């Protein structure tokens, strides 16, 4: 069995955050976290996912970490179509709250690896990587309350900020970077912020770590 796996992500920050969580895992999970430099974002990620599944790569597992953005159901359908098109059986119609993992499969087109899909932040909610990080801010943090008020005010007075229809998904990006700018060491990147005691890993962080472990472990997929 191959001793390395791959996780495909949308961009640099996603790569660094996923790698930071892999590094803190109690098990040695040898995943290479990959994105296409110069082609960041979901369309490129989906294309890479589709292409990788046709290559008959000798890898232990292939994971995809994508932002749900404002349409969780639509994003899931897009990735589920890739899985079904590649020949995986039993692809669910809705995302698994714990993150999808399907075992390896021999199709008429390719030898398919164990595969997993995680939609940021929690496979159920609109949002993105930054939404996942914001949920680690301690409850009652006074600077967080101030950041929320400040960002709300910006939305009201400046048309450069997202329109109302996309605020729910994109507001966490403005919030977390505003909050990080006010820390003792201001402006730390998201992946470095994970190492600081000012953040408190919670349920979503634990679920994501568990998903990584299942993606690595033979026989841990749904229905096995």
Could you say what each language-model-derived stretch is?
Residues 2, 21-32, 46-61, 68-224:
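C-terminal accessory helical subdomains adjacent to catalytic cores in phosphodiester-
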Residues 7-10:
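Short hydrophobic beta-strand that contains or immediately precedes a catalytic carboxylate
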Residues 12, 38, 67-69:
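An acidic- and aromatic-residue-enriched active-site/binding cleft used to recognize and process polar
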Residues 13, 40, 124:
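Short alpha-helical
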Residues 14-18:
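Short N-terminal binding/cap micro-motifs at the start of the first secondary-structure element
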Residues 34-36:
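RNA-recognition motif
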Residues 38-45:
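Conserved helicase/translocase motor-coupling segment
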């Amino acid at each position: 069995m191959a001793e390395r796996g791959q996780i495909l992500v949308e961009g640099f920050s996603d790569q660094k955050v996923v790698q930071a969580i892999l590094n803190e895992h109690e098990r040695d999970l040898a995943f290479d976290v990959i994105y296409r430099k110069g082609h960041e974002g979901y369309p490129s990620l989906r294309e890479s996912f589709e292409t990788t599944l046709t290559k008959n790569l000798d890898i232990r597992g292939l994971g995809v970490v994508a932002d749900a953005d404002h349409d969780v159901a639509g994003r899931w359908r897009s990735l589920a179509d890739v899985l079904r098109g590649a020949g995986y059986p039993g692809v669910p119609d809705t995302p698994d709250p714990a993150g999808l993992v399907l075992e390896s499969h021999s199709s008429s087109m390719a030898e398919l690896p164990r595969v997993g899909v995680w939609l940021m932040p929690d496979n159920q909610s609109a949002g993105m990587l930054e939404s996942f990080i914001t949920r680690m801010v301690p409850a009652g943090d006074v600077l967080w309350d101030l950041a929320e008020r400040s960002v709300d005010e910006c939305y009201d007075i400046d048309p450069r900020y997202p329109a109302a229809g996309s605020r729910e998904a994109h507001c966490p990006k403005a919030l977390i970077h505003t909050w990080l700018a006010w820390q003792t060491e201001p402006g730390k990147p998201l992946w470095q912020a994970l190492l600081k005691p000012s953040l408190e890993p919670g349920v979503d962080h634990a679920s994501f770590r568990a998903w990584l472990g299942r993606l690595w472990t033979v026989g841990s997929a749904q229905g096995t």
